[in-house]
Each structure stands twice: as structure tokens, then as C-alpha cells.
Amino acid sequence: MEEFPGYFELDRSRQHDFLYPLIFRESIYALAHDHGLNRNRSTLFENEVDYDKKYSLIIVKRLITRMYQRNHLIISANGSVQNPFWGHNQNLYSKILSEGFAVIVEIPFSLRVLSSFERKEKDIAKSPTLRSIHSIFPFLEDQFSHLDYLSHVLIPYPIHLEIAVQTLRYWVKDASSLHLLRIFLHEYWNSFSTPKKHITLFLKGNSRFFLFLYNSYVCEYESIFLFIRNQSSHFQSTSSGVFFERILFYVKIDHLVEVFVGTDFLDIRSFFKDPNMHYVRYQGKSILASKDTPLLMNKWKYYLVNLWQYHFSVWSQPGRININQLGKYSLDFLGYFSNVQLKSSVVRNQTLENSFLINNAMKKLETTVPILPLIGSLSRAKFCNALGHPISKPTRNDSSDSDIIDRFVRICRNLSHYHSGSSKKKSLYRIKYILRLSCVKTLARKHKSSVRAFLKRLGSELGDEFLTEEGVVLAVIFPKASGRLYRGRIWYLDIPCINDRVGDAEGSIFTK
């Protein structure tokens, strides 16, 4: 451990972030604005009527003051807490308080990010090991064909809210703020509309504050896991600390030393020695991939289980973390089915006297469109039935024909855009057929006409709208190379923005 003092040492100037007085200052919104904390500008707007969309930190201060008043917290005889303060506006107040807490608790971490970015901007520019979410798909294409084993892991979240507060305790050395946070979480959780005691992440309406709690937990977990991974790899990452701070994973904390208590750190490094271990995380899930034997993957699996269980008090069943061979397993990843296949390439070798054939087997990543899940999503969105037969979609009476057509065309283009990286795009023709015929049936239903009569009257205009694909756009931008480009994979940078919800792979596409 003596060779890593700088890694575990916590900056003493950051140990006493006293946030409690900031909660009651009405000028806090100006400080937040000056330091770039207004990513969601609606949080900081004042004097707005629609508080479901606009929040005021002045109102946050007043609500916290009322929450602390004794006559609003009544302790009943059986020990349960009743809070008539919330009343019929419990949803509204909890949302306002949640947004206010999110802005305040992000202040010290955002200041660290800005200072670290200014201090290490040159290192970030020179670092070859930084990765962002936009590089996930090219990473799969470049690296997965050279790997053998893969484990797809759902990152468990702390069941009890107290664990999330304890995670923040190592960052915020302010007992008053943590005490207020603990009270707020219990009040907010009681007013939350779900009966289950867990936090459902990555929903469209989820609060900024709960996402912040989740990110702090993931930062803590990855600080420990990736530190071990980097020290055990032959190709150690020299910029992991900068990488964490760049994406809101701010500092490594001294508490992770407890993981190695009573254990020789050099033994741990030799135990997990793996030159080709890759780690990818995306929206609550992670992928571990390796070129080594499945025995080493099993070691990493049980290390993760023990880390979650003993360090974060989160139970994770080892049997739910499967280790699969890439050649026999299809990875369901952000709306794609990906696997590694052997492709044979026959080369004829000619000499002066003989000729012979050489058969070369090469691994190649295949990404296919999940046609059945897509049809299921279309069925849930009322574009077709469960068997994939197009049906008319109910529309508003005041919708014009052009608005209806534009909506269907936009969905069709989003699908083509999102699956442009697929190696086999022919299955998308069926999806486009369903959308086109559903559009025609919707228009025919609106005009109280038959599909055949409406198509005859409309002519080829509708078909021209649906046939405009990436190939036509590329032909305008790259007239000489458009054919070669469109035949290959095209990974667009806004793919994660199109599919912003994991779990319903195509749900967000069909709602736009």
C-alpha cells in the first residue's frame, strides 16, 4: 500500500463542505447560475405559475423552514410519523424540494469538476484512454471480435435509502446537511407514488436528485473496482482519475482503503492479472469482457458480489451474473442484438507449378435488428397488432393530414437512423411496411374512406416521403462515396439521445 499514498489521500481542503447555510440563502440561485449548475434552467426560474415545470429556490427555503416547524411533525403513539404539512400538494412540494436539494448538493462537486478541468485540461486533451458514451458502439465493433468471454451485469442499487446517504457522507462532511437530507428522503419517499421500496431509475419523469444519488453510488463502486482493474492490467490507464472527474465522478476517497484491510495488495493484483479486461457501463448496466479463461471471469464476478455485499450492503445473487462465450451468445445491447461470428475467406494461391486454396477464418461482430421486440413495441404503441399486421392509429380530430404523415415519417427515419450501424438492415423493411400501411389506414379512417381508394387518390407522394433514407442524405453530402459509405455501418453520435430509456428498447422512438 505504500506505493499508492497519493491515490488514497483525500485533499484536506475538501473535507468540510458546509452546505447547510446555503439551503436558506435566497441568493443561492445566482451562485448556482455563475458556476454552470443551471443544466436544467427551469430549476432556477423565479415567479412562475406552473411549478410542475418551474421551480424556485426561494420556495424551497420556505418549504424546508415549514418542514422543520414542530407543529407540522406529529409523532403518534405507535411511533409512526404523520405530516399534515404535505396535504393535497404532497407531489408538488416533494418535487420542488427534490429539485432544490439537487442544485444545492451538486454545488461542491461541480466546483471540484471545474477546478479539476482547468488544472488538467492539457492532460485530458493528450489522454488516449478517455472514453465517452459516443464511443460505445465503435468500441464493440473494434474490440469484441478479439475477445472470448462476456458477462452482462445489472448494477444493483441500494435497497435502503440510508445506504445512499452514507455514500454521500464520505463526500459531504456536513452533519447538518446530511441530517436534513435524511429527513427529506423519508418525507419524499412516503409521498412517492410507488409501493415498492426501491428506486426505479432512468424513467422519463425521474427526479434529478435521485439520479444524483445513483451517480454518487456508482462513483463509489467504480472507484474501487476500476482501481483494482487498472492496477492488475498490463496496460494501466494513466488518466482514470481525470476521466472520473470529467464525467461527474469527482475524486477517489480514502474509505476504499478498507477493502484491502488485512490483505496484501500485491497478491490482489496478481490474483486478477488480466491484460485484456474491458469494462463498459451504460445506464444501470455494465459489461465485462475478457480474452482470458472463464476462470478469471469467475474471480471478477465473485469479487463484484462481495464488493456490493460487504462494502455497500447490497445483496446480489452470483447465479444472476452469467458468463457467456461470445461466439455462442447474442448480447442485447441498447436495441441491438450483437454477437461474434466466424467468417470464412477463401484465397487462391498460385505458384509456377501448383495452385491451392487457403481458407482463412476471421471473427467479425454482427449487429442485427431485433425484429420481434420492434414489432412488440409497435404493437404497444398501437401501430399494429401482436402478429405485426398494421392497424389504424387513433388521432385527434384537428390533426391535419400533413401532421399525421410527418409523425409516421419521423418515426420511420428515427428507426433507420438508430439502426444504421446494423450489419443486416433488410429486416427494417418489414417495420417500414408496417408504419407506412398504418399511416395509410389512419388517414383512410380519418376521411372515412377505404385504403385502396385513399391510396389511389394520394398517389406516390406518401411513398416518396417514406423512401427518403440515409442513403439519399449521404448522396447529397458525399456524392462520390455515398454508395460505399451506406453499405457499411454508420454509427451516429446521437444514438444514445434517440434511445434514452433502457428496458423499453424502442419505446422512446415511437413516442416522438
From Swiss-Prot:
GO terms for cellular component: chloroplast. One of its GO terms (molecular function) is RNA binding. Its main location: plastid. Keywords: Chloroplast, mRNA processing, Plastid, RNA-binding, tRNA processing. One of its GO terms (biological process) is tRNA processing. It is found in: Plastid, Chloroplast. Transmembrane segments: none annotated. It comes from the Eukaryota. Belongs to the intron maturase 2 family. MatK subfamily. Usually encoded in the trnK tRNA gene intron. Probably assists in splicing its own and other chloroplast group II introns. This is Maturase K. It comes from Oenothera biennis (German evening primrose).
